[in-house]
Amino acid sequence: MEPYSFEASADLASIREGYLANGVVVIRNAIDAARLEAFRETTRKVVYARARSAGIDLADGLPLDEAFNRMCAVDRALGGSVYNCLRTHPEAVKLIPDRVIVRYIEALLGTTDVYYAIDQVHFRIDRRNEERFSLPWHQDYWWNNTTRNAVTMWLPLVDVPQELGPIRFLLGSHKRVAKIRVDPMFKVKWDQNRLFELAEPVQDDLGVDIPVSAGDVVFLHALVMHRSGINRSERNRWSFLTRYADMFDPQFVAKGWKSGIRMGYLSILETDPECVVNRGEIVEPEQATTA
């Protein structure tokens, strides 16, 4: 078995050792099948409700992918509202503090004082030929920015073999904050998909793809370099993720627990200005109006 892959029954010390070495671990079969099915069924109901509210007549009993794709064929924007709902639907909210997840978070962070980054909960629906929504090589810290040792939990709701585009990781790359460029227009025109880009190239073929099955859970370090996989199949890649940090990490406490991003604000400019190589190029709103 790969050094980053563990069964749910593995001892926590070994899991932590693998995590600290690689910046990522996969816990196989961590979530039971019944719970996953409940998550998927709630998801399917949300898709049906949104489609029908828009006057789209979906036949009863369609598989989740088919229902979602038919809705998006009429109006792709409806998929965005499904995403926004699913970020905080009941099955997601119940999972965030569940011991089935948090026992691993505590081991990886080395503390029981866990901060739940509720504003960093996401639901992804990655489809074929929609690479514009995929993220290139990045560190979650740029967006999350709670602490440098924060942990992301990524849960696939479906099997993610090679053709569905598993996440690609640069193992052991979690030792420093990478040099980045920020979108110099972020205070004027907010585009979350282009906020950050690496200032230093990554050799793509050094990355390791980590295929996963529904029920596996991936835990990744805030600084580990990774990128979205490209979905080349006809099936959709459904996944849920959230983030955690040490509540009493000195860096986090010193900034009053401020974190993340919001329109017109990137906290990494306050915490790690030396890592933003183009910070002198940022355009202020008043500059844009007088240009």
Where do the protein language model's features map onto the residues?
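Extracellular structured ligand-interaction cores
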Residues: 24, 148-152, 164, 207-209, ...
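Short, conserved beta-strand element in jelly-roll/cupin
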Residues: 145-162, 211-214, 219, 243-247
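Short, solvent-exposed loop/turn segments at secondary-structure junctions
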Residues: 31-33, 123-124, 142, 160, ...
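Glycine-rich, charged/polar anion/phosphate-binding loops
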Residues: 137-140, 154-155, 204-206, 224-227
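Non-heme Fe(II)/2-oxoglutarate
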Residues: 5, 49, 53-58, 73, ...
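Active-site region of the double-stranded beta-helix
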Residues: 114, 139-146, 155-166, 172-174
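Double-stranded beta-helix
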Residues: 162-225
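Non-heme Fe(II)-dependent double-stranded beta-helix
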Residues: 1-21, 28-137, 143-144, 266
